[in-house]
């Protein structure tokens, strides 16, 4: 289950896609034009997205991923949310970054995946929290009121140790040696999909 959660199809590197997804989802819960975005990231995610190129653009980084999430991303596509980004979308995102409406804050030092995307308008705000997997939405708020909370939110508190951190090297090696092929056959499918994508020409 852990492997499947971390191997969802994505357009480009998963961290910028996850940021765009979070911002786009928050945007959909705001009943007015967005005037400011505040993005809270853990250090591991911040670092991984900081220098990553974003597909269909010549840009990198957390702020630009958030800006594209605001103007162009489809949250229903999750990590494929930036598929179909146009040159016009890129120009709009450049303007948002230049105008300084995107604030990116590194909250704490940890390798744990966590994104808190807050979008604000003149009268309202919306917030989306993603934790432990790039599309695992654990909370959605509108004007401070929780409208969605994952069933296991109580077990996903910040101080809980993620499952993978509780596994020893021996546990992992034992799993590798004993897992039935059928349970991990999807890994081969992911490799094939990746090979197809890297063989495609990039957009000029």
Task: Indicate where each model-derived feature is located.
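Catalytic-core signal marking the mid-to-C-terminal active-site face
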Residues: 33-190
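Short, N-terminal intrinsically disordered low-complexity segments that are rich in Pro/Gly
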Residues: 7-16, 180, 184
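Alpha-helical support elements that line or immediately flank enzyme active sites
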Residues: 16-32
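Generic N-terminal amphipathic, Lys/Arg-enriched alpha-helix
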Residues: 1-11, 47, 171-175
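Short, conserved micro-motifs enriched in small and acidic residues
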Residues: 12-17, 56-60, 204
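Conserved small/polar residues in nucleotide/adenosyl-binding loops
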Residues: 196-204
């Amino acid at each position: 289950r852990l492997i499947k959660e971390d191997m969802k199809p994505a357009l480009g590197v998963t961290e910028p896609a996850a940021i765009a997804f979070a911002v786009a989802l928050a945007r959909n819960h705001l009943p007015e034009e967005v005037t400011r975005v505040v993005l809270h990231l853990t250090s591991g995610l911040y670092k991984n997205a900081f220098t990553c190129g974003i597909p269909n653009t010549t840009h990198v980084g957390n702020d630009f991923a958030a800006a594209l999430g605001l103007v162009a991303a489809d949250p229903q596509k999750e990590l494929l949310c930036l598929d179909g980004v146009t040159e016009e979308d890129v120009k709009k995102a450049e303007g948002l970054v230049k105008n300084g409406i995107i604030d990116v804050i590194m909250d704490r030092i940890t390798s744990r995946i966590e994104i808190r995307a807050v979008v604000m308008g003149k009268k309202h705000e919306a917030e989306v929290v993603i934790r432990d997997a790039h599309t695992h939405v654990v909370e959605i708020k509108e004007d401070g009121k929780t409208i969605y909370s994952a069933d296991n939110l109580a077990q996903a508190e910040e101080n809980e140790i993620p499952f993978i951190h509780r596994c020893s090297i021996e546990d992992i090696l034992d799993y590798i040696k004993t897992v039935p092929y059928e349970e991990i056959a999807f890994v081969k499918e992911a490799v094939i999909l990746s090979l197809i994508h890297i063989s495609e020409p990039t957009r000029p």
